[in-house]
Amino acid sequence: MRYVGRTLGIGLNNGKPFAFYLLCSRSFPNRRAVVKGNGVYILNQTETENPYVSYPVVRLMEDYAVVTNGLHTDFIAQALEWERPRKALVHVLDALDYERDDYSTPRIAGIIQHGGRRGWLGFVGRDMLWMRELELEEGKAFLTATYNMEGFESIELAFSTPEELAEKVMELPFEHKVLAIGIVENEKGWELSFTPSL
């Protein structure tokens, strides 16, 4: 199995957009997800001076859901107030660049739109910056990761409940999995799910 670090994806299930986040970690496996307001946060449970291991991971908005592996979650959400997803991704990722840690960890991001069938993925690493606007496909997800994944990949991913989405993400064939978060469109907005459950 591959070690991909942080992974996120966007897709379409029963005609509705969804997104997910999979935290895989060798260095800081003792982390948990916490819901606060319209956001989800990854919190590290051990002492460290590393500023990158606790961060906002999901931000739910009226029209969009944003998922990333760092503090750029909130910057992208703010940018979406006045510009389109593709520009929000490019502007924020270009401005913040990759993480200045021992691994030069890339920043990754995904956006889905309520009622939409298109999604956006973005990536910035030491020597690469890209953004893709994608036509979402029924029963599939497009995903990207911080390590050992060239660009983005497509996988089959269908589910019947938000909880099953998080469970299936946790079953993806990647090493050192810690937790998974699912984001699914519903009539009122967005629904979250977690594995392990909160």
Curated annotation (Swiss-Prot):
Disulfide bonds: none annotated. Pathway: Purine metabolism; IMP biosynthesis via de novo pathway; IMP from 5-formamido-1-(5-phospho-D-ribosyl)imidazole-4-carboxamide: step 1/1. InterPro entries: IMP_cyclohydrolase, IMP_cyclohydrolase-like, IMP_cyclohydrolase-like_sf. Coiled coil: none annotated. GO terms for biological process: 'de novo' IMP biosynthetic process. Pfam families: IMP_cyclohyd. It is an enzyme of class 3 (hydrolase). Keywords: Hydrolase, Purine biosynthesis. The keyword Hydrolase applies. Belongs to the archaeal IMP cyclohydrolase family. This is IMP cyclohydrolase. It comes from Thermococcus kodakarensis (strain ATCC BAA-918 / JCM 12380 / KOD1) (Pyrococcus kodakaraensis (strain KOD1)).
